[in-house]
Amino acid sequence: MDALLQLKGIDKAFPGVKALSGAALNVYPGRVMALVGENGAGKSTMMKVLTGIYTRDAGSLLWLGKETTFNGPKSSQEAGIGIIHQELNLIPQLTIAENIFLGREFVNRFGKIDWKKMYAEADHLLAKLNLRFKSDKLVGELSIGDQQMVEIAKVLSFESKVIIMDEPTDALTDTETDSLFRVIRELKSQGRGIVYISHRMKEIFEICDDVTVFRDGQFIAEREVATLTEDSLIEMMVGRKLEDQYPHLDNAPGEIRLKVDNLCGPGVNDVSFVLRKGEILGISGLMGAGRTELMKVLYGAMPRTSGYVTLDGHEVVTRSPQDGLANGIVYISEDRKRDGLVLGMSVKENMSLTALDYFSRAGGSLKHKDEQQAVGDFIRLFNVKTPSMEQAIGLLSGGNQQKVAIARGLMTRPKVLILDEPTRGVDVGAKKEIYQLINQFKADGLSIILVSSEMPEVLGMSDRIIVMHEGHLSGEFTREQATQEVLMAAAVGKLNRVNQE
């Protein structure tokens, strides 16, 4: 089968860094090509070379069989290559049609926008994707999943033959993911080629036909997905076997550190649980069940309307995140780019931001040497891959950004560490490193709450698991009792609380 798009021998270097070396990618009509690799493997750089954002240093790009060079995203877009970024590129205050044809509005012979034609064309594109809403609806009124469908419709408006999807399900519910997969199958049937960039193994094996593996900027292999197992694919990605994906540390938890009684707040109703020293408490549940809301009420980022929280036997009241930090409760957000990190600031500034009191003199000036020493220690402990602590954190991979976010929380010397989706958007190798760090904190007696949508992660790392459903606690299980089936039954409200101390 002839490829729609073929990149061969692609090299790209930046000062001091060889980002791509002999990289290759083929995209075939009517097939989904997964592009996988650890964070920093070169996937994003390859997409920027492909779409003309970066100029390649060496190699060839064949588009529809002809040697081609794109001089920017507009050039590749007009040629028929569409890209849907992880962060959606839509304006909430405009309608669907206005977003789809922004800058390309239909104009009548009097020089005015032909609204009737524009909405008709947009409705036609939505119908191609079997979507039930009309194009006169505001984008801001749509769910994230439906907004993603608008991005696909926008790509189709350019008559794109190849569509690149970057972590497309990162913010989607299971139902929205199913809808996306139906659309991808429809696009395949129309002969379009899809590039599917994802860390989620389950999705790759469900929706992709072929897979291309990158490692350290190099092309490793192209295989049919049907010929692989998850283990063999991961081994190609990381260059080694991951013997134990979830390295659980089996030690006896200590005395009760945190006690929550009848806690209520926005999206949280009458929740009670305990957390012991040196224990990992997993929090499971479906999207919208109230897991993140519970953590934010506990930490002080959302108001508590009733209930009691005691820490080491003393009642604590957290009316703000500052109160949470002052009492030894640290919350690492599920959205590190929005809530957790200042992307334009350096690794050092991000890591020490909430711990500046520890590096301040009486007069308010900073002890810069102490700050640098502490940041350097954490960079080594966490194996953060960065040229220097002065590097802008926005330039690091997702896994390294997450390590910095966790390190920042630990700099305040907390008693309770809340990790909300700690490995979201993180590759398999970096995940393993984060799990090992979590075990290290656990061994040191830190009390950890692990909130995750990935059931294998919760099952693999937790000592106990509580499940939430519609703001309530719907189940509590020991490690031995917990299975995916039991957790799912509790998550949909079909199982009563069965655990017991």
From Swiss-Prot:
| InterPro entries per record | AAA+_ATPase (IPR003593), ABC_carbohydrate_import_ATPase (IPR050107), ABC_transporter-like_ATP-bd (IPR003439), ABC_transporter-like_CS (IPR017871), P-loop_NTPase (IPR027417)
What does the record give under GO molecular function?
ABC-type D-ribose transporter activity; ATP binding; ATP hydrolysis activity
This protein's UniProt keywords: ATP-binding, Cell inner membrane, Cell membrane, Membrane, Nucleotide-binding, Repeat, Sugar transport, Translocase, Transport
Q: What class of enzyme is it?
A: translocase
Which transformation does this protein catalyse, written as a reaction?
Answer: D-ribose(out) + ATP + H2O = D-ribose(in) + ADP + phosphate + H(+)
Record bears the keyword Membrane: yes
Chief location category: membrane
Ranges for domain ABC transporter come to: 5-241, 252-495
Q: Binding residues for ATP, per the UniProt record?
A: 37-44
Membrane topology of the entry: Peripheral membrane protein
Location(s), subcellular? Cell inner membrane
Task: Tell me which Gene3D superfamilies the record gives.
Answer: P-loop containing nucleotide triphosphate hydrolases
- Gene Ontology CC annotation, any one: plasma membrane
EC assignment:
7.5.2.7
| Pfam families cross-referenced by the UniProt entry | ABC_tran
Give the quaternary structure: The complex is composed of an ATP-binding protein (RbsA), two transmembrane proteins (RbsC) and a solute-binding protein (RbsB).
Q: Which family does it belong to?
A: Belongs to the ABC transporter superfamily. Ribose importer (TC 3.A.1.2.1) family.
Instruction: State the function annotated in the UniProt record.
Output: Part of the ABC transporter complex RbsABC involved in ribose import. Responsible for energy coupling to the transport system.
What is the name of this protein? Ribose import ATP-binding protein RbsA
What is the organism of origin for this protein? Answer: Salmonella typhimurium (strain LT2 / SGSC1412 / ATCC 700720)
